[in-house]
């Protein structure tokens, strides 16, 4: 069976692995997933990520914990295949008053809502992280 929403699958795998207190979670890789993992690492939500394999690339994400609790408290998919959410630079949402981040796919690449505001671009709001 084909996967309808690979990004939602990635976020669910991360949530499930954190609930099970796993240190690493693996999944099929794609360009979008690697870009989202890079943003999560840059923002300090994950410890690291690695892409392995040539024919069927696999993305391994090293999860991060603080005092035994996951660093990521909430990970939600915003835009989905059935209902895409595109926002202009002025309408980009702030997560929990600026404490969390929205990950946005723009014409300048995948970035946080703060970086998109600084660059003056809007785009598709992929997910929110807190």
Swiss-Prot record:
Keyword Transcription (UniProt): no
Source superkingdom: Bacteria
Protein source organism: Pseudomonas putida (strain W619)
Single Gene Ontology BP annotation: translation
Gene (UniProt): rpsH
Protein name: Small ribosomal subunit protein uS8
Membrane-spanning ranges: none
Subunit structure: Part of the 30S ribosomal subunit. Contacts proteins S5 and S12.
Keywords associated with the record: Ribonucleoprotein, Ribosomal protein, RNA-binding, rRNA-binding
HAMAP family: Ribosomal_uS8_B
Stored InterPro entries: Ribosomal_uS8 (IPR000630), Ribosomal_uS8_CS (IPR047863), Ribosomal_uS8_sf (IPR035987)
């Amino acid at each position: 069976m084909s996967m309808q929403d690979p990004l939602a699958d990635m976020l669910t795998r991360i949530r499930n692995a954190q609930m099970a207190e796993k240190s690493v979670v693996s999944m099929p890789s794609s360009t979008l997933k690697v870009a989202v993992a890079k943003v999560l690492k840059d923002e300090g939500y994950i410890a690291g990520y690695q892409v392995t394999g040539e024919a069927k690339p696999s993305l391994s994400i090293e999860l991060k914990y603080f005092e035994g609790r996951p660093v990521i408290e909430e990970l939600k998919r915003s835009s989905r295949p059935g209902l895409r959410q595109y926002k202009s630079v002025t309408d980009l949402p702030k997560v929990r008053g600026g404490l969390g981040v929205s990950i946005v796919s723009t014409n300048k690449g995948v970035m946080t809502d703060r970086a998109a505001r600084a660059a003056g671009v809007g785009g598709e709001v992929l997910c929110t992280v807190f």
